[in-house]
Amino acid sequence: MSLLTEVETYVLSIVPSGPLKAEIAQRLEDVFAGKNTDLEALMEWLKTRPILSPLTKGILGFVFTLTVPSERGLQRRRFVQNALNGNGDPNNMDRAVKLYRKLKREITFHGAKEVALSYSTGALASCMGLIYNRMGTVTTEVAFGLVCATCEQIADSQHRSHRQMVTTTNPLIRHENRMVLASTTAKAMEQMAGSSEQAAEAMEVASQARQMVQAMRTIGTHPSSSAGLKDDLLENLQAYQKRMGVQMQRFK
């Protein structure tokens, strides 16, 4: 796997699923391929994106700045600086300085990533902030190692909390989670169906599912009533795709 492919993988792992993720993936691909060279416009676009946490925006801004060639005197962006200040905690800053000194001795992406993984997310963010604010310099490869270590830690904690939600025995949370998944699946079906005539059926199924979820939320239903809702929808979607000549082996 190439270095940039690895960086893209790690960075996208912390972006929530949805149309915005697809857009960010496209921007990263363009940047890494050297197709997007307007850092100013890129940062302005990133700053105004909804949903993303300040830290995720900070990490993306850092990656764009590392990759897109820019004039020497280009102003650093406040939204990135604020996200990469380790919550203003002096302990994070102290650790970030120690980490920075170690990173200066590293020359490879994997070496830097290994060193960085033993630090907290706050210290890692602060260290990125040091480099972003030009208080320190490391090679691009080492900086990418730092980025990927940070993303790995964030993705780990997201995965833990997601697993807790999925395996929770609380029926109300499971019920709500199934309804949310059914609703987003229905939304995806509507987007995929487009405007062809054969799509009317898929649109109808999706629309009914969303109305059903709305009704279930409005009147309050037994927690087990949502079981299988998303799977039913996915079966419908696969049947529709088969008729359209699209064969997707895995959608679950």
Swiss-Prot record:
It is found in: Virion membrane; Host nucleus. GO terms for cellular component: host cell nucleus; membrane; virion membrane. It comes from the Viruses. One of its GO terms (biological process) is viral budding from plasma membrane. Keywords: Host nucleus, Membrane, RNA-binding, Viral matrix protein, Virion. GO terms for molecular function: RNA binding; structural constituent of virion. It is a peripheral membrane protein. Pfam families: Flu_M1, Flu_M1_C. SMART domains: Flu_M1_C. The keyword Methyltransferase does not apply. Residues 165-252 are annotated as: RNP-binding. Residues 1-164 are annotated as: Membrane-binding. A motif (Nuclear localization signal) lies at residues 101-105. Plays critical roles in virus replication, from virus entry and uncoating to assembly and budding of the virus particle. M1 binding to ribonucleocapsids (RNPs) in nucleus seems to inhibit viral transcription. Interaction of viral NEP with M1-RNP is thought to promote nuclear export of the complex, which is targeted to the virion assembly site at the apical plasma membrane in polarized epithelial cells. Interactions with NA and HA may bring M1, a non-raft-associated protein, into lipid rafts. Forms a continuous shell on the inner side of the lipid bilayer in virion, where it binds the RNP. Homodimer and homomultimer. Interacts with NEP. Binds ribonucleocapsid by both interacting with genomic RNA and NP protein. May interact with HA and NA. Cannot bind NP without genomic RNA. Most abundant protein in virion. When expressed alone can form virus-like particles in transfected cells. Belongs to the influenza viruses Matrix protein M1 family. This is Matrix protein 1. The gene is M.
